[in-house]
Amino acid sequence: MTRQLDLILKEGGANYDWKTEFEVQPQYLDARGKGWLAHGLEELGGKGSFPLFEKIQIDFKIGRTLILWDDELVFNRYRGITFRSEMYEEFQFTFLEGHKRLCRTYEKEALKTGMQQRLWVGSPLATRIFGQPSEPGDFHGVGASGWKLLAYNHLQVDLLSRIHGFKLIRLSPYETLMTAGSLKRLDQLLINPKEEQRSMLYGWLMRKLG
């Protein structure tokens, strides 16, 4: 999907960076921010000190705006838990309410790919922090340690992007746009879009930049 978005931005003449990163400055994280991350980890059932990114991978960077594509796996109960953080009351994110709703609605879609061992269990870091996961598909007990780490990492990206002075836009497959008189999902529109659809999508992205 990001490849198609890259082509749309390029065709529209946008000045942007694709598949880039920014380096985290740990000194920007104050006591309040550390508290938000520690509490987020605890709410997900994590133990120990919270891990902090050294660099954050970004799909697109346009000026001081970062754009990330969130795939189906993102939208689950654990990401929903992170959205309860006081951080989201302190900072405004345009995607917040929509993403909260998607987490409540589309967990079954996350399960279609997310029960794979590498995703459900996650990395050794995931099991160290959250413990040994339950069987794939079973949310009792520990549940999905890999999913939990992913949710925590997204909380971390939201916070770190803001304290580094960036605006963050998160795109989802489930966003709907009006085209040719009907609503279509973003992921469907990005499959071989026609010229007029590419132009419409470019305009839509530019409006999101504000």
Which stretches of residues belong to each language-model region?
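Nucleic-acid endo/exonuclease domains
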Residues: M1-G210
